[in-house]
Amino acid sequence: MRVRACLAVLLISSAAAAPAAEPRLVLLGGGRAPEAALARFVQWAGGPRARILVLPWGGEDAREGFQAVKDALRPFAPGVVETAPPVPLRDDGRVELRRRLERATGVFLAGGDQQRLLDAFADDVVAAAVRARYRDGAAVAASSAGTAAVSSLAITGEGDFTVIDARQVAVRAGLGLLPGVILDQHFLKRQRENRLFALVIGHPRLLGVGIDEGAALLVRGDRHAEAVGGQVMAVDGSHRGELRVYLLNPGETFDLEKRKRGRAAERTPGR
């Protein structure tokens, strides 16, 4: 127990050594990722000097999942793309994860099975280390199940989605990288509106964001968001007795904090 506590301190403190940068997220809805979104991720991570750490823990074959991400990023020429140690992690694996995280300028949460990925992040030491590295300035990209895991309240994929009832939508604790937002993916393609509507009604303080297959949402500073490559839906349940639904087309922006659209000509800062 004492060893785990010490490792948690090491993982968090080592990631916090450098000055904090504005948080940057590239959230992919699954399927074929928009090239513009992958290019932005590599740019945010440092371009040719980028060192990307892939967490392929949601897939049945972690090596195959890692290779798929590496192949997708290759056209954008990051400096290094490496994989995380396999889960479940023991003490030596956590130390190795710390070593790879502290030198990473970008972290990629690959897709797969949401439950399997959330099982990996149920290790508090691992989850805290990823959060700390993100808050310390590493760009984070996530795809499919990885996108769902970014939420504080993460959709597991299980439940009865024929009704709009939050009690029928299974959720677990996620990473919480994007405060106040619950994320869904493969959204319009797989007709997942019911489960997101249900969770927003059940948790009106959370903004629901559904990212369609082939689309992405670029987010800076936990707030400034831009749809890329396809459609993104934002669902606001904070107004008593009604849901406000916003459909964002590629290039359109949204303020996640104010829960309002940006102007069509605006773009996410720091392009």
Residues of each region from the PLM?
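Catalytic-core regions built around general acid/base machinery
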Residues: R100-R103, D123-G137
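Portal/gating segments that form or line small-molecule/metal binding sites
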Residues: G59-R103, L109
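Structural motif
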Residues: L27, G106-A110, A141, D184
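Hydrophobic h-region of N-terminal signal peptides that target proteins for export
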Residues: L10-P19
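Bacterial N-terminal signal peptides that target proteins for export
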Residues: M1-L7
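C-terminal and late-domain segments of enzyme folds
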Residues: A20-R49, G59, R63-P75, A154-T156, ...
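Glycine/threonine-rich flexible loop motifs
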Residues: Q114-D124
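Catalytic nucleophile loop
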Residues: L109-G111, V130-A154
